[in-house]
Design a protein with these regions (language model features):
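Intracellular, membrane-proximal regulatory regions of polytopic membrane proteins
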Residues: 1-39, 300-376
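Hydrophobic alpha-helical signal-anchor/transmembrane segments
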Residues: 19-30, 34-305, 318-327, 354-359, ...
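Short, well-structured alpha-helical interface segments that form or flank functional binding sites
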Residues: 290, 294, 361, 365, ...
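Long, well-ordered mid-to-C-terminal structural blocks that present hydrophobic/aromatic surfaces
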Residues: 379-395
Length: 550
């Protein structure tokens, strides 16, 4: 572009942009520049090795401090995002029951808007302080040939049917959402407004269809709609008297779990199908990266013996037989011998090159070094390849040390995502369902008692009636908590992946797919079991409790 007078001036200007983010990169680059002006070969190699150790050691030191400083923010995130909100969920149903001005949408604004924003902000602050380093990339973004693997591929003979993951995800989501919202749909289609399926307190009647709204003889109900007593409850002129509210039924609460399944599992399926094929290809390349240092060392030795690169690849392929590295070198060798390609074409050809099957920036960079250095002769290429081999080993060593530093934090966050958060939230939903059911049945029995005896006949018990508002239906409460669990799983997965792998969009999508499906299913199973157990216990107690003979 002729903006700068020399390459050095252009490079210095470029390095200025890194000053704020990565000083060790600038220092290492200056050492490489200095090596170009050294007359002594020994001194030149020493400077190059120094540049490598500077960037690796400084990165490790930064990550060490990051890991040490991570404990406090993660604890704060855990308390503000998980412990305190879930403890609050135990109290909030009681607040709603005794403060009729508080509605379910107030809780939704707190749990599904305010808290996720706070947790996301805290998480982004944690990630923003992470030192830059080696990170994985989405290989489908760099290689257009791999974009087809973002779809679900079904082989049919010689053809492949590609299905967009969004279609499958949308189908699953729509079916589960219809099932989840069925209590509201049934109520909307019911012209009388009184239809319900109930389990009677009298065991001899069992399950039957009821035409009485808020049937006092029902132990459990499917819908459980009732007429509002207004706010404040039981007082003349109260707001909302006679409005139909609900659904309060156990059946509706259980069916509402399908809404969360639709959102959580639907999103999980989308992320899983979009990334699973590509992650398999990348994992294969990662396996090659693990063995690549040893194979490069062997390749360097063959080149050092004076063998041309074409023959050296075949020799290494024979030695590294029956593993991924051997397959890579064999692919290169076959392209050279059978297709008459040059070494560069055999590796980088867009259609048949070895890099098509093993997409990796690390391997690609190593092979480019080999190609450029081999132009200056086998001995120069041998030294270059052996140096790259040592560099890869050093990167692997530092990477393993970093994983060891972060292991406690990462394992703690993964356990929260996979089990603790959905399980605790599921238990809270079960307890809430029981509390709401007991308060609702007590309110119903007191109202029936009032209608039979009047306010005067109740005496001192009369003020108790106004204590019991409608409360919040478990149907809505479960939606709020379930959606919060899905949001929390999403945010924590993004944070965990960012801490562990840095900027890795492909790994993030794959982790989101696995965690959203597994954690949502865990939440649904725990919620369903606890809800049934606690409601069976409370139903048995309330069926034996008769206020004033009611």
């Amino acid at each position: 572009t002729e903006k700068y007078e020399s390459v050095k001036e252009s490079m210095d200007s470029y390095l200025e942009t890194w000053k704020r983010w990565n000083m060790e990169f600038i220092e290492a680059f200056h050492l490489i520049e200095s090596s170009l002006y050294e007359s002594s070969e020994e001194r030149r190699i020493s400077l190059l090795e120094k540049s490598l150790s500077v960037i690796l050691d400084e990165t490790y030191e930064k990550m060490l401090h990051y890991a040490q400083n991570l404990k406090s923010p993660i604890t704060m995130l855990h308390m503000l995002g998980i412990i305190m909100p879930i403890l609050g969920l135990v109290i909030l149903p009681l607040v709603v029951s005794f403060m009729c001005q508080v509605k379910w949408f107030h809780l939704a604004a707190l749990y599904n808007i305010a808290l996720p924003i706070i947790v996301y902000y805290l998480g982004k602050n944690i990630l923003s302080s992470r030192p830059t380093g080696y990170g994985d990339t989405d290989i489908s973004e760099e290689n257009p040939e791999l974009k087809k693997y973002r779809n679900m591929i079904i082989p049919v003979g010689n053809f492949e049917i590609k299905i967009n993951p969004m279609i499958i995800s949308a189908m699953v989501m729509i079916v589960l959402l219809i099932i989840g919202f069925s209590p509201m749909l049934i109520h909307m289609m019911d012209t009388t407004g009184n239809w319900d399926i109930v389990v009677d307190k009298d065991d001899s009647k069992g399950i039957h269809i009821s035409s009485v709204m808020d049937d006092p003889d029902a132990k459990y109900s499917l819908l459980g709609y009732r007429k509002s007593q207004g706010c404040p409850p039981g007082e003349d002129g109260a707001v909302g008297v006679g409005d139909i509210v609900g659904p309060f039924g156990l059946g509706a609460a259980l069916l509402s779990l399908m809404i969360i399944a639709g959102i959580g599992v639907g999103l999980g399926i989308y992320f899983r199908l979009k990334s699973s094929n590509i992650i398999k290809i990348r994992d294969k390349a990662k396996e090659l990266e693990k063995e690549f240092a040893a194979s490069l060392f062997q390749l360097g030795n063959r080149l050092g013996d004076g063998l041309p690169a074409e023959i050296a690849f075949a020799k290494v392929a024979e030695v590294m037989e029956n593993n991924v590295t051997g397959d890579f070198f064999r692919t290169v060798s076959n392209n050279i011998t059978r297709m008459g390609m040059s070494v560069e074409q055999a590796i980088f050809d867009k259609k048949y090159g070895a890099m098509v099957y093993y997409p990796s920036t690390l391997i690609e960079s190593s092979m480019k070094v080999l190609i450029e250095s081999s132009k200056k002769g086998p001995l120069i290429a041998a030294k270059a390849v052996i140096s790259v081999s040592r560099y890869i080993k050093e990167i692997h060593r530092v990477d393993e040390r970093l994983k060891d530093l972060m292991s406690d934090t990462i394992s703690s966050m993964k356990s929260q995502i996979k089990f603790l958060t959905p399980a605790i939230a599921g238990i809270v939903i079960g307890i809430t369902s029981m509390i709401t059911g007991i308060l609702g049945q007590l309110g119903t029995q007191l109202r029936v008692l009032t209608e039979g005896q009047g306010q005067e006949g109740l005496g001192a018990a009369a003020p108790m009636i106004s204590m019991f508002g409608e409360g919040i239906p478990t149907f809505y409460f479960q939606l709020i908590v379930g959606l919060y669990v899905v949001q929390l799983i999403y945010i924590l997965t993004v944070i965990t992946n960012g801490i562990e792998n840095g900027s890795d969009s492909l790994g993030e999508k794959y982790s989101l797919g696995a965690n959203l499906i597994n954690s949502t299913v865990t939440y649904i199973i725990v919620s369903m079991i606890i809800m049934l157990i606690f409601n069976i216990i409370s139903g048995s107690i309330m069926s034996q409790l008769k206020l004033g003979g009611v």
